[in-house]
Amino acid sequence: MKIYLAGFKGIQNHFNKSTKDIYLLSSFWEHKGGRYKDYVMQKKHILDSGAFTAINDKTGKYKNFDWDIYCDKYISFIKKTKQKLFFELDIDCVVGLKKVEYYRKKIEDAIGIAPIVCWHQNRGSDYWIKCCEDYNYVALGTTTATKIGKKIRSNPWSLKWFINHAHNNNAKIHGLGFTSTKWLRKLNFDSVDSTSWLSGRYGSIFKFKNQKLNQYNPKNKRVKDWYALHIHNFVEWVKFSNFAEKNF
């Protein structure tokens, strides 16, 4: 299993080691201004469309967003940075599924590679079955922001149906934001992504030891150097990611 660590941009100017052997996820939204570093073009990188960020913008700035233009820019960025793995624009709640399928086809036709299809509860189980038959890489949304997401998180065994159906159709499956260290050993996703290493912002400290990633929350302590803590946690998650790739 591959664990892609998201949110690296926050420490990119403070992490002085090579990332070429680290699985990273970044969002087009982070780079849409045209600025990005080499890690975006490395082999072990997966690109998110950034659509979720735009949809959930609290300022209302993107209420009347032109998704046609955004899709065109997304395609241009994928081409320019030679991405091999990238997600579709899963914006069903804004433009509807038919438009999402239109954008998916547009991206595939322009790049020559199908984007990773992102299933959410509104699409229904039949749509998951069809996607597993039609695409070789699919993603499963389990965010707690939705009712079904909360239900799944409370009973992760329910994910087995999705995982098994994907594998039975020779499709790879990605768990969007699913990195429960307890359940990753039990659920055979092909890949997942996580920002959990950034929970240092809440004072959490991670330590990979004896094949386990442990989380500590020291009480009555103040963080003197936030970047040092984030980098420490990032390194420990990289260790866990390396272990997971070989053993999960």
Q: Model-derived features: where do they sit?
A:
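Histidine/lysine/aspartate-rich catalytic loop segments that bind and position anionic ligands
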Residues: 117-149
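Active-site-adjacent beta->alpha loops and helix N-cap segments on the catalytic face
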Residues: 30-40, 93-106, 123-127, 145-164, ...
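Conserved, mostly hydrophobic/aromatic
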Residues: 48, 117, 187
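Alpha-helix-loop-beta-strand connector modules within alpha/beta enzyme cores
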Residues: 44-46, 105-113, 153-183
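Glycine-rich anion-binding loop/nest that anchors nucleotide
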Residues: 139-142, 170-180, 191-196
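Non-catalytic, usually N-terminal nucleic-acid engagement modules in DNA/RNA processing proteins
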Residues: 1-108, 240-248
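Catalytic cores of alpha/beta
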Residues: 62-65, 125-130, 179-194
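C-terminal accessory extensions appended to soluble enzyme cores
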Residues: 201-248
